[in-house]
Amino acid sequence: MDSFNYTTPDYGHYDDKDTLDPNTPVDKTSNTLRVPDILALVIFAVVFLVGVLGNALVVWVTAFEVKRTINAIWFLNLAVADFLSCLALPILFTSIVQHHHWPFGGAACRILPSLILLNMYASILLLATISADRFLLVFKPIWCQNFRGAGLAWIACAVAWGLALLLTIPSFLYRVVREEYFPPKVLCGVDYSHDKQRERAVAVVRLVLGFLWPLLTLTICYTFILLRTWSRRATRSTKTLKVVVAVVASFFIFWLPYQVTGIMMSFLEPSSPTFLLLKKLDSLCVSFAYINCCINPIIYVVAGQGFQGRLRKSLPSLLRNVLTEESVVRESKSFTRSTVDTMAEKTQAV
């Protein structure tokens, strides 16, 4: 990818920050990987092992519960998106090891990176949807009792997947391969044909819909849930606070570098020193974003109960309790203060 201009980011080192500009100077390539690339490879390896196993377990647990619990619908869709994203990691790994050479052909250049992007954005939007559901359970319990059903949950998931698909379309439409000779390699990237306005518009839309809006949803929903929980408990446990901080902070920390570098590069000239520096950090930023795909199962387990209880209980059983427990809407016709507090505490693990 030495001869590529980076523009709007995408997942992989054949990403949307790569545009095909033959006038861009070719960097001198070394057989030694850069330090950011090496760090990215290490992160990808860890995320692959933890993410594939963890999300596969979540899919297995929730698949048996989707017919009777709404929570299982949320977490099944989220785990599927994260699981598919993690399965694509060998593609990114192979590209980095070969100095960003794309060995999979032109059709795969359009399809594979776009599928990666689809699953990643679906994961983000589903996470925001789950947080909104938790908010409604706490603040609109009567409405949830009357209208919160499996059909509505599946519709919400379909909307999240549909919006993720829309965010992915530019990657599919503008992605092409380019053959380079110094050194010999095939590069996969997007070509906006020097249309900077279109490139910047894509970057801004992805930043707003794929990061700022979900982040705002997570922050607002969990802040109000936290305030309600604390205001109605005689003994204010720090457990709820820890879960809220873990969810919001992990999303913000791991996605921020990718989104910031992406929007900056869409507005910078490819020859600028800042652009070239961000280009070298691309692999590391993508790997950080990928951490969010494997961290959710970890949060589920930690939020389930104390460490001693986890040692006495099988992991599948623990996950089943965390992921499929339903609100007290189904158990009671009226929501007392104690039941609302209990539900608010138990539905934080997203």
From Swiss-Prot:
Residues assigned to the Cytoplasmic compartment are: 65-69, 133-153, 227-242, 304-350
Q: Which loops or segments lie on the Extracellular side of the membrane, by the record?
A: 1-37, 94-110, 175-200, 266-282
Description of post-translational modifications? Sulfation plays a critical role in the association of C5aR with C5a, but no significant role in the ability of the receptor to transduce a signal and mobilize calcium in response to a small peptide agonist. Sulfation at Tyr-14 is important for CHIPS binding.
Cell compartments where the protein resides: Cell membrane; Cytoplasmic vesicle
Task: Give UniProt keywords alphabetically.
Answer: Cell membrane, Chemotaxis, Cytoplasmic vesicle, Disulfide bond, G-protein coupled receptor, Membrane, Phosphoprotein, Receptor, Sulfation, Transducer, Transmembrane, Transmembrane helix
Q: Name one GO molecular function term.
A: complement component C5a receptor activity
GO cellular component terms attached to this protein's record: apical part of cell; basolateral plasma membrane; cytoplasmic vesicle; plasma membrane
List Phosphoserine occurrences by residue. S314, S317, S327, S332, S334, S338
Q: Where is the segment annotated Involved in C5a binding?
A: 21-30
Q: Does the keyword Cytoplasm apply?
A: no
What is the annotated role of this protein in its UniProt record? Answer: Receptor for the chemotactic and inflammatory peptide anaphylatoxin C5a. The ligand interacts with at least two sites on the receptor: a high-affinity site on the extracellular N-terminus, and a second site in the transmembrane region which activates downstream signaling events. Receptor activation stimulates chemotaxis, granule enzyme release, intracellular calcium release and superoxide anion production.
Q: Which family does it belong to?
A: Belongs to the G-protein coupled receptor 1 family.
- Supply the name of the protein: C5a anaphylatoxin chemotactic receptor 1
Recorded source organism is Gorilla gorilla gorilla (Western lowland gorilla)
